[in-house]
């Protein structure tokens, strides 16, 4: 902890310290193409350590399972959590909620991305392809721009 705090204080005089929660890292994308928000299949992210810039943007550094290797009830729970985050924050067409699922099956909110990545290594396109077609999603988004609750 001491070395981590020294590293943090090298950037600023304030630091946010959070409890570490061990578990499965999940990314749940929510899309709204005019029919209300719906969650895409959750993406399970597996790395050899940290999910940092290198692990995100260099193919082969992370492994993705879509849908996540969870039972259906847990998948529905994390999808509902992501939709709740999306609607509570009043988000528009797209968001991606990152969660940690602990060993008891409780999803812990990490953050929400209101402009999720759309590159070949980004998680929303991976989830969209697993559900059907990324091209179909793009088409629906173009036909229904700037949807807000």
Q: Where do the language-model regions lie?
A:
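Peripheral (often C-terminal) accessory segments that flank ATP-dependent C-N-forming ligase machineries
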Residues: 67-68, 73-76, 80, 88-96, ...
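C-terminal active-site "lid" helix and adjoining low-complexity regulatory extension at the edge
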Residues: 101, 106-149
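Phosphate-binding site of ATP-dependent enzymes
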Residues: 1-80, 106-108
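Residues at alpha-helix termini
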Residues: 10, 88, 129-130
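A generic structural-conservation signal
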Residues: 17, 95, 136-138
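Gly/Ser/Thr-rich beta-alpha loop segments that engage phosphate groups in nucleotides
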Residues: 25, 92, 118-119
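Short Gly/Pro-enriched turn/cap motifs at secondary-structure boundaries
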Residues: 18-20, 86-90
């Amino acid at each position: 902890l001491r070395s981590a705090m020294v590293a943090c204080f090298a950037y600023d005089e304030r630091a946010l310290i959070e409890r570490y929660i061990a578990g499965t890292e999940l990314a749940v994308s929510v899309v709204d193409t005019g029919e209300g928000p719906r969650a895409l299949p959750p993406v399970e992210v597996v790395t050899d350590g940290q999910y940092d810039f290198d692990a995100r943007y260099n193919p082969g550094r992370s492994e993705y399972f879509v849908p996540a290797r969870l039972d259906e009830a847990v998948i529905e729970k994390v999808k509902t959590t992501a939709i709740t985050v999306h609607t509570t924050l009043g988000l528009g067409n797209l968001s991606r909620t990152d969660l940690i699922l602990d060993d008891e099956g409780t999803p812990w909110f990490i953050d929400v991305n209101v402009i999720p990545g759309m590159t070949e290594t980004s998680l929303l396109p991976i989830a969209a392809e697993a559900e059907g077609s990324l091209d179909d999603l793009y088409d629906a988004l173009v036909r229904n721009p700037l949807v807000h609750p």
